[in-house]
């Protein structure tokens, strides 16, 4: 009985494979579409995708093309081929602006780019693209069923950009390029006013300004000490109980001590 079951299973598998290979070689686009949709519904996206790609050009302009293009894009999405799915969903949105699948296609196009977004330490071009597409989606569908997920994705991507900008500024501080560090932290503070990195950004901007001032040639020192002092004031006003306050106070006291000689001269 058990042997009969395995034999039957092998026959069915062989028959299925034979049917698929036959469809691949066939000129019958209806047969390809029918089998492709069946395979898609069974979760066999790679095989379905291969059949769909063969017949898409031949269905262009026909009523079935809308469904075919969506299934093809979604098959790539389900296979985690996000560059391909993002591209195909974009084409679908452009080709079928009145489709009942438009909302889902636009969301999955944006989410494809979200999936392509790398860790914060790498280039963030795909992160920026994903944010733009997610924002466009929210603008078009402000009450979408995907809105909660979209907002979550946006927050995650924005945090990644914050981390990237902060890490660049902090790296300048680490390698003693203090002017670049100050400029980068200035931009960070303006671009991300509510960031969780704001406390650190204000402190390390002050630290960079202090290091720059104390290591400056004499004729630049006084102005730079005054600038560093102003950064200290901003930091302390915002974070009087910061974990960095002790270090900040030490640097501030040193600044005051160094400024005394300029006050004496005047």
Across the structure, where does each feature detected by a protein language model lie?
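Acidic, polar-rich low-complexity tracts and alpha-helical solenoid repeat scaffolds
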Residues: 5, 13-266
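Sec-dependent signal peptide recognition
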Residues: 2-8
């Amino acid at each position: 009985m058990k042997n009969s079951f395995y034999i039957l299973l092998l026959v069915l598998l062989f028959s299925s494979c034979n049917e698929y290979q036959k469809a691949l070689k066939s000129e019958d686009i209806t047969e390809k579409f029918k089998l492709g949709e069946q395979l898609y519904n069974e979760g066999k996206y790679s095989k379905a995708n291969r059949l769909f790609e063969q017949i898409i050009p031949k269905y262009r302009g026909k009523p079935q093309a809308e469904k075919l293009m969506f299934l093809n894009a979604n098959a790539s999405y389900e296979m985690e081929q996000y560059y391909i799915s993002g591209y195909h969903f974009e084409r679908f949105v452009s080709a079928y602006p009145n489709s009942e699948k438009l909302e889902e296609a636009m969301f999955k196009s944006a989410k494809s780019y979200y999936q392509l977004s790398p860790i914060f330490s790498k280039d963030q071009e795909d992160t920026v693209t994903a944010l733009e597409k997610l924002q466009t989606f929210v603008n078009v569908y402000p009450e979408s069923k995907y809105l909660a997920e979209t907002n979550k994705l946006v927050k995650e991507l924005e945090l990644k950009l914050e981390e990237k900008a902060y890490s660049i500024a902090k790296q300048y501080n680490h390698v003693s390029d203090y002017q670049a560090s100050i400029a980068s932290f200035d931009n960070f503070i303006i671009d991300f006013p509510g960031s969780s990195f704001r406390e650190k950004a204000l402190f390390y901007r002050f630290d960079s300004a202090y290091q720059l001032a104390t290591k400056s040639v004499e004729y630049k020192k006084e102005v730079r000490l005054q600038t560093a002092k102003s950064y200290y004031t901003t930091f302390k006003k915002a974070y009087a109980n910061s974990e960095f306050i002790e270090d900040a106070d030490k640097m501030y006291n040193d600044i005051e001590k160094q400024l005394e000689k300029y006050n004496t001269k005047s």
